Every structure is written in structure tokens, then in C-alpha cells.
């Protein structure tokens, strides 16, 4: 039976699934709606599935690469994804992503919470909501929300992850590359020389756009391989990635359920509501009211109503 296509409650938390996580199937979670939202930036990568947690908290789930993994990293409609989530009230995002490890101590099937990022995409992805008559410069010194990251790391370090020797790491440097091809060995070793810990293809501009939308954002990285720097390891292949991703999938769902249970507590409600980010984009706008193009203001106010008009 099809799910309802409307949902009247505000949804403050979203989970974005990446490679290997196209649905959020955790014990006690109940799907209650499926929303097809059209934004001024197009349609998101998948419908927004609204679920109720065992704590009766409504959350949104979005499959970054589409329901059938049909979107390459470059093709992901990042602006539509973030705008759609913010338009239904989302203020916190827990995003999952498969990554390659650039360091020996981060083993395949380990989980990582990054704190910094280096952008190695190639300018092919729309990376801002400020454009064409509306200029804004939102700070991005700390790309991942530190308080939300702490909650995620603490939960992940508390026996939630299954598997012998599986660890949760924090304060990692994430490299985001264009893809869809994997790195050359020279590139992989270059990123290691920069201090890179893990590498993926999807953190940007997702994290940048979330910050512009005043959404607290954290990425949970799931290590699938050693990229290709480790010469005594076979070069990374899709088969390697998908095999480890399958093993990571169950852990990701356990972790997501535990994080959402923790975030339902009263002590985290200001964090979940991103109170510390309110007004960030409004005050970052440099364009005088007389110079703001109405059509651009209308687009961005789809998710930030009344900010610039």
C-alpha cells in the first residue's frame, strides 16, 4: 500500500544515505509518508521518506544517489536535496558516506567522524544558493558541526558498532574528490602527504549547502578500502567497496538508530534545532536590498522565507 504523500508535522532531523544505504530500515522505525518535493533547484535525488522512530520522533531519509544508485557524485542534485529538507523543517543532518582510508590505522569497516575537509572537486557542481543577484559569504572554517559530531562519536564509541576490531575515529581530515573514477596512486600519496585521513566523492558541496541553509551537519564516513596508496594491497575496485559496504550497512543502521535515540533527549533540542546557526545566511548577505533580483530571492526564500525580501 503506497505511503501518504503529505505530512503535517515539522521534521527537524534528516538522515542522508550514500553508497550501500538506500533506505533506513532499523528496528522500531515506521515509514509514515513519502514526499515528492519540487524545489526551485529541481527535484531531490529521491523522495523524502518520513519515518517515526521508537521515540516517536519524525525524521526524513533521503537517498543521495537515488533509489537505485543511478546518480554519479557529480550528478547529485545537492541544492535540491538540501532545499527540500530545509523546506520541511530540517535543522540537523546525519549524512553517511562510503570512504577510502588514507591511513593505516583506519581500517576497512571502521567508521570515521571528520572535522575538516579539502575540496578536490572540479567546479562541476553547483555549490551555493547565493547567485545571480544575491551575494553572500557564509563562513566555512568548521565544515562539520562540532557539537553534533561529538554526539555521533560518543554514541559510536559506546559499543554500537559490531565486528572484531571495528573502531570509531574522530577529528579526521576528509578529502572530497570529483570522481566517479578512483584516485591514481600519485594522487592518493599526495593526499596522504597533506595529512588526509579518508577520501570520498560526496561531502561537497553537500556540507557547504547545509551550512548556507543553517543546518547542523555531520558526516559519518564508513571505510571500505585503503584507496590505492597501499602497494601491498590490491588496487581499489567496485567489488571491494561493495563487499565492505554491505558489512558496513548493518552497522550504519544500528548507529543511526542509536544517534536518533540520543538526539530525542531534551538536553539536545537546541542542537537539533540548530539554534546556534540561526541568521547565519541572513547576515552573510552583502547585496543591498535595492540590488537583489526578485527571482533569485524567491528561489532562496523557498527554504529561508522572509530572509532577503
Swiss-Prot record:
Q: Which CDD domains match?
A: MTAP_SsMTAPII_like_MTIP
Example GO molecular function: S-methyl-5-thioadenosine phosphorylase activity
Site location (Important for substrate specificity): 183, 238
BP GO annotations? L-methionine salvage from methylthioadenosine; purine ribonucleoside salvage
EC assignment: 2.4.2.28
Where substrate binds, per the record, is at 201, 225-227
Which family, according to UniProt? Belongs to the PNP/MTAP phosphorylase family. MTAP subfamily.
Relate the protein's function as given in its record.
Catalyzes the reversible phosphorylation of S-methyl-5'-thioadenosine (MTA) to adenine and 5-methylthioribose-1-phosphate. Involved in the breakdown of MTA, a major by-product of polyamine biosynthesis. Responsible for the first step in the methionine salvage pathway after MTA has been generated from S-adenosylmethionine. Has broad substrate specificity with 6-aminopurine nucleosides as preferred substrates.
What's this protein's name? S-methyl-5'-thioadenosine phosphorylase
